[in-house]
UniProtKB/Swiss-Prot annotation:
Species the sequence originates in: Homo sapiens
Tissue: Highly expressed in fetal and adult brain. Highly expressed in the cerebellum. Weak expression in kidney, spinal cord and testis.
Domain PH: 8-112
Name of this chain's protein: Docking protein 6
Domain of life: Eukaryota
Function in brief: DOK proteins are enzymatically inert adaptor or scaffolding proteins. They provide a docking platform for the assembly of multimolecular signaling complexes. DOK6 promotes Ret-mediated neurite growth. May have a role in brain development and/or maintenance.
Domain remarks in the Swiss-Prot or TrEMBL record: PTB domain mediates receptor interaction.
Subunit description: Interacts via its PTB domain with phosphorylated RET.
Ranges where the IRS-type PTB domain occurs: 132-237
Cellular-component GO terms for this entry: cytoplasm; cytosol
Length: 331
């Protein structure tokens, strides 16, 4: 994990063709890798001083790139072309052949995941596509300092159907920490943050973890979908156990229940699928199931400025940031 992470891959003076005048103009170009501050992109400034003070600049996000190539010398000397899948392109010329090669190499490595000196004339690497897909499914986040962990900084977040993982930004194979989705108490987001509260069953123990990211909404939706699936699986198992208990009770046989899945450690996530309602939670009593009712936890509503103070009182300290939470009770 990098607390002093630098997202600048390469920068320098180049010449970019003006769309209005059709002539090449000199500017300062900065290539930044994907991070918690934003996606992979090119930032164009009038000069180096403007880049230092972060003055007005134009940004080109590097998504859906089809190819990155060098242009023939007769077309434009020391030129690099970025070709997108929609057949549009962006071309710039460097001040030397060495600079052009450097720009092309870094762009290919970051945007296409390849190295110029890699020669793959034999059979295709069947694992490469899967590895690349897994890398693309990770989100760039910045873990804010917290007393529960001795690490913080830039990293990548992966969300599976059961867990949340943090991976090292420099070595994608190094796992930093893991939280089971079933042990989260609540989670929320806004446009630049994602946060969740872990329960005591997690390796980190109880605590609030906050991440700075431009992909807070996407992370939230993926976590929420996974927790819904866990809740539905839990509900299906409870129904199967109830039916089996009733059948064995009617046959006056001893009841033996096998646990087919690992149930969420947090107590009853039914509120995720049915918010602001009361539902039945079955508990095993003797050889059968007796049903008792208990109020489900409330899913925190989205922040609204016009809310009264009384409506905001149930929210926790972290909700003052404007996050919309989904919550569950921890046993």
């Amino acid at each position: 994990m990098a607390s002093n992470f630098n997202d600048i891959v390469k920068q320098g003076y180049v010449k970019i063709r003006s769309r209005k005048l059709g002539i090449f103009r000199r500017c300062w170009l900065v290539f930044k890798k994907a991070s918690s501050k934003g996606p992979r992109r090119l930032e164009k400034f009038p000069d180096e001083k403007a880049a230092y003070f972060r003055n007005f600049h134009k940004v080109t996000e590097l998504h859906n790139i089809k190819n990155i190539t060098r242009l023939p010398r007769e077309t434009k000397k020391h030129a690099v072309a970025i070709i997108f899948h929609d057949e549009t392109s962006k071309t710039f010329a460097c001040e030397s052949e060495l600079e052009a090669e450097e720009w092309c190499k870094h762009l290919c490595m970051e945007c296409l995941g390849t190295r110029l000196n890699d020669i793959s004339l034999g059979e295709p690497d069947l694992l490469a596509a899967g590895v690349q897909r897994e890398q693309n499914e990770r989100f760039n986040v910045y873990l804010m300092p917290t007393p529960n962990l001795d690490i913080y900084g830039e990293c990548t977040m992966q969300i599976t159907h059961e867990n949340i993982y943090l991976w090292d930004i420099h070595n994608a194979k190094v796992k930093l920490v893991m939280w089971p989705l079933s042990s989260l108490r609540r989670y929320g987001r806004d446009s630049t943050w994602f946060t969740f509260e872990s329960g005591r069953m997690c390796d980190t123990g109880e605590g609030l973890f906050t991440f700075q990211t431009r992909e807070g909404e996407m992370i939230y939706q993926k976590v929420h979908s996974a927790t819904l699936a866990i809740a539905e699986q839990h509900e299906r198992l409870m129904l199967e156990m109830e039916q089996k208990a009733r059948l064995q009770t009617s046959l006056t046989e001893p009841m033996t229940l096998s646990k087919s899945i690992s149930l969420p450690r947090s107590a009853y996530w039914h509120h995720i699928t049915r918010q602001n309602s009361v539902g039945e939670i079955y508990s095993l009593q003797g050889h059968g199931f007796g049903s008792s009712k208990m109020s489900r936890a409330q899913t925190f509503p989205s922040y609204a400025p016009e809310q009264s103070e009384e409506a905001q009182q149930p929210l926790s300290r972290s909700s003052s940031y404007g996050f919309s939470y989904s919550s569950s009770l921890i046993q």
